[in-house]
Design a protein with these regions (language model features):
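N-terminal secretory signal peptides
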Residues: 1-19, 23-29, 39-93
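An acidic- and aromatic-residue-enriched active-site/binding cleft used to recognize and process polar
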Residues: 25, 64, 107-110
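Boundary at the C-terminal end of the N-terminal hydrophobic targeting segment
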Residues: 34-35
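Long, solvent-exposed, polar/charged low-complexity segments
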Residues: 50-52, 144-247
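An exposed acidic His-Trp-rich patch
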Residues: 96-179, 183
Length: 247
């Protein structure tokens, strides 16, 4: 189950894996690939994109340049055959619908898995606590109740994201891949980016934030942007004991 192992209980327990999979619609599911080129193959191969997926929308920023921010669409599989239940993998796009540009990939692990990573590896992973509690992360295909359950589940997860198309305004991917970081405190987001996202999905980040604060029961995190590419992420506080504050 994707839940933070080192902290608190939420006002309602997060979903177990069965409940989580039940929420995932077959968004972006692909038809099985035919195997006509192999006469001995009677059954078609299944596409890696087939099966239950979740779509959620967040605001990404570049770790090396926190002012570089853009709305990013995530299409994530919850069953990767990775050998454990604490791993998702996501394809990232600049928009929904046909013609969207493939920006990159993101991998998501539980807090328990993150804690076991080598120290040198952790600099690539960003926290999701502020994205959830600040209202920046939404799941457009879910009902409000299901979205809340989902957000409680991913609250303390960590993501490793690279944008291999660093500037979606270019006709083709130009430049080196961008290591992506997360917004982690009030005042860090570009309000124009938030406003554009809210208009597109007809939602209110402020109302989402208020509802999640009430349901989850924690203050929003307050973590400064990374000083450099080697900085490690934190989930709740800028220094000291990295634990949440109850409302």
């Amino acid at each position: 189950m994707l839940s933070g192992g080192h902290i608190m209980s939420l006002r309602e327990p997060p979903m177990d894996r069965r409940e989580l999979l039940a929420l995932f619609g077959a968004i972006g599911a692909a038809a099985p690939l035919a195997a006509d080129d192999h006469e001995g193959k009677k059954e078609p191969h299944a596409s890696p994109l087939a099966g239950p997926h979740a779509h959620f929308c967040g605001i990404h920023m570049a770790k090396k340049d926190p002012k570089f921010q853009l709305v990013t669409q995530h299409y994530c599989t919850a069953d990767t055959q990775a050998g454990h239940d604490d791993f998702f993998q996501c394809i990232l796009f600049d928009r929904t619908g046909p013609g969207a540009k493939l920006l990159g990939v993101e991998y998501i692990v539980s807090d328990a898995v993150y804690r076991k990573l080598p120290e040198e590896e952790k600099k690539y992973w960003h926290a999701h606590t502020y994205e959830v509690l600040g209202g920046g992360l939404i799941a457009p295909g879910m009902t409000p109740d299901d979205e809340m359950k989902f957000m409680k589940t991913i609250l303390t997860t960590w993501g490793k994201a690279w944008h291999t198309w660093p500037d979606p305004s270019t006709a083709v991917p130009i430049g080196e891949p961008l290591l992506i970081w997360s917004l982690m405190a009030d005042g860090q987001v570009d309000e124009k980016v938030v406003a554009a996202r809210d208009r597109e999905f007809k939602c209110s980040t402020a109302k989402i934030r208020a509802a999640r604060a009430e349901a989850i029961g924690f203050e929003v995190p307050n973590v400064a942007p990374p000083k450099d590419l080697n900085a490690l992420g934190r989930q709740w506080t800028n220094d000291g004991d990295d634990k949440p504050k109850k409302k």
